[in-house]
Amino acid sequence: YLAPKQLGFRTSMNRTYNEYEVRNNFGGLTIPQYNKMFNWDRDYNLKYDITKSLKFDFTAKNRAFVNEPFGKVDEGAFGYDADSSKTQMVNSIKSFGETMNYGHTANVTFKWPFNKFPLTDWITLTTRYSGNYDWTRSPLALDNFEVIDENGVAQTRKVGNIIQNSRVVTW
């Protein structure tokens, strides 16, 4: 019981790139749209049996967004510079990206020792405490947006994050 029963870490990176352009049926100017997404998911878990009757487990999930330059990924097109793009992505990865979602759950389970006494060896009672925490970042598009107030003055606003937590005790 000196070492954890299980210690785990999993990571995955998912990078997608889409380029959309409307079919030019009318001879007008068509502007392509680019959709880039580079997510980095990390999962952690720990299970530790402190004693035969007392057990602890912890799991956490983190989703981060890796920053990269806007626009088309094409060497030499529209001022795209592969070296600066790589530098920006590597720096973002070194700082573990920008966390968008984080959540963890901790559980403590205790099995009461009624089986140690002859009169109560037929009773089984387990108590479990579970605590949960979730954090969601505001959308990147809403980091700094302007709102025109009743006087016609533009004011910069920032949307907040969402935090939720809960706890459950079961007998």
What does each model-found stretch correspond to?
Residues 18-27, 67-77, 136-146:
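Outer-membrane beta-barrel translocator domains and adjoining extracellular loop/strand segments
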Residues 30, 106-126, 130-141, 156-160:
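Extended amphipathic alpha-helical scaffold segments
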Residues 36-42, 100-106, 163-171:
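Residues that define the transmembrane beta-barrel architecture of outer-membrane proteins
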Residues 44-48, 106-114, 171:
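Residues on the lipid-exposed face of transmembrane beta-strands in outer-membrane beta-barrel proteins
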Residues 11-19, 60-66, 129-137:
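Transmembrane beta-strands of outer-membrane beta-barrel pores
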Residues 27-32, 89-97, 149-163:
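Extracellular loop and loop/strand-boundary signature of outer-membrane beta-barrel proteins
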